[in-house]
Regions:
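Bacterial N-terminal signal peptides that target proteins for export
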Residues: 1-10
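Short, compositionally biased P/S/T/A/G/V-rich stretches that sit at domain boundaries
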Residues: 28-47
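Short, solvent-exposed loop/turn segments enriched in Ser/Thr/Gly
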Residues: 49-57
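Short, solvent-exposed, Trp/other aromatic-anchored flexible loops in extracytoplasmic proteins
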Residues: 89-149, 154-161
């Protein structure tokens, strides 16, 4: 009889402890994307040509009442009307320590490794007859959960001057 009481006590204590810890917020309820900028980043020179890479920069805020942990962000770039992916970039955005309720992190800068090349000045490349607009889909994923689409935007025909390294919260 003593063993059964002891097991019940351990089970009850474990359940109370687990209930007190609470669960992490999920991507749909917690992640708010703001301060979004799209455009083309300077991709340097390749074979004597200027390169432009479609890019998105953004910040996120935890709008939930509890922390969110382990969130990755993925930007997928496509030429409008083309089902093939032009490029994508995945970053670890929020680590194991989490993002507390009401806090924000970023900016994150994600870019395609493929874009446009030309001999003309970068600003003039937007006027070229072969230039086609690109769209970006931004996704987030928490742990082993499914990807959630956060936004879909047409990349603005503008040059961006933004930091090269994405910010991450460990």
């Amino acid at each position: 009889m003593f063993r059964l009481d002891r097991r019940m006590f351990v089970l009850a204590a474990t359940l109370l402890l687990a209930a007190g810890c609470g669960r992490s917020a999920t991507v749909p309820e917690a992640i708010e994307v703001f301060d979004v900028k799209t455009g083309y980043d300077d991709g340097g020179h390749a074979s004597g040509q200027n390169r432009l890479l479609p890019t998105i920069a953004f910040k996120v805020r935890n709008k939930a009442g509890r922390p969110i942990h382990r969130v990755q962000f993925n930007a997928v770039f496509r030429v409008i009307g083309d089902p093939e992916e032009l490029g994508a970039q995945l970053v670890q955005g929020i680590g194991y320590s989490g993002l507390p309720a009401g806090q924000e992190v970023g900016p994150f800068t994600l870019r395609s490794m493929f874009g446009y090349s030309g001999e003309q000045a970068r600003r003039e490349m937007f006027q070229h007859a072969s230039f086609q607009d690109v769209q970006v889909q931004l996704f987030a994923k928490q742990g082993g959960n499914q990807w959630v689409k956060l936004s879909e935007l047409v990349v603005d025909r503008q040059l961006l001057l933004i930091a090269k390294a994405p910010a991450a919260r460990k």
